[in-house]
Curated annotation (Swiss-Prot):
Membrane topology reported for the UniProt record: Multi-pass membrane protein
Keyword Membrane (UniProt): yes
Record localization: Membrane
Native organism: Xenopus laevis (African clawed frog)
Transmembrane intervals: 13-33, 45-65, 73-93, 176-196
Major subcellular site: membrane
Extracellular topological segments: 34-44, 94-175
InterPro entries given in the database record: Tetraspanin/Peripherin (IPR018499), Tetraspanin_animals (IPR000301)
The protein's name in its UniProt record: Tetraspanin-31-A
Annotated coiled-coil segments of the chain: none
Length: 212
């Protein structure tokens, strides 16, 4: 049977949703592993990653059930959700790729200010640094963070602040994040196209007089 047929479309849609399920389970597993080993202590970060994993898992399950049973309603819901996810993910990915250094600094500074002391201390220990950025505007907060910091720098003259360390890798990280996001956003468009095509194909094993 050619690849445009019913069986091929069904198998391709099932395979795509199995990949989504594996990615969702991977996100949940990595978040649980990070929390269990104390790599990330913030419940908000852990909860966010797990929520994304569960959401992706649910979408994949809906798509998989819809593909296996050729369920019209489930396939329609699957297409609508994937389109909404694509729009959001495409905008976020493009924003990551377009973000310059001053915008990165503003974003990281805002995020740092909203962090709890526990999360800041955890980051300082992981990155081996103290404080965010030693600038005139943030001098008071920087001194406060340094006073609470437990990391001891072997050479104070060569020590970078956490902001400097994060900004050194932020550009590369954002490009990777944006690129991966764009890749997955186009797989979502592929999923919508496969679901639409499969939804409008007739099951050769079904009653010839039945509607799709």
């Amino acid at each position: 049977m050619v690849c445009g047929g019913f069986t091929c479309s069904k198998n391709a849609l099932c395979a795509l949703n199995v990949v989504y399920m594996l990615v969702g389970l991977l996100l949940i597993g990595v978040a649980a592993w990070g929390k269990g080993f104390g790599i990330v202590s913030s419940i908000h970060i852990i909860g966010g990653v797990i929520a994304i994993g569960v959401f992706l898992l649910l979408i994949a399950i809906i798509g998989l059930i819809g593909a296996v049973s050729h369920h019209q309603v489930m396939l329609f819901i699957y297409m609508v959700v994937l389109i909404l996810v694509f729009i959001f993910q495409f905008i976020v990915s493009c924003s990551c790729l377009a973000m310059n250094r001053s915008q990165q600094e503003y974003f990281l500074n805002t995020t740092w200010r909203r962090m709890s002391n526990e999360t800041r201390l955890n980051l300082e220990e992981t990155l081996e640094c103290c404080g965010f950025l030693n600038t005139t505007e943030a001098r008071e907060l920087f001194n406060k963070d340094v006073a609470l910091c437990s990391h001891v720098c072997p050479d104070p003259h060569k020590c970078l602040s956490c902001g400097d360390k994060m900004l050194n890798h932020a550009d590369e990280a954002l490009k990777i994040l944006g690129g991966v996001g764009l890749f997955f956003s186009f797989t979502e468009i592929l999923g919508v196209w496969l679901a639409f095509r499969f939804r409008n194909q007739k099951d050769p094993r079904a009653n010839p007089s039945a509607f799709l």
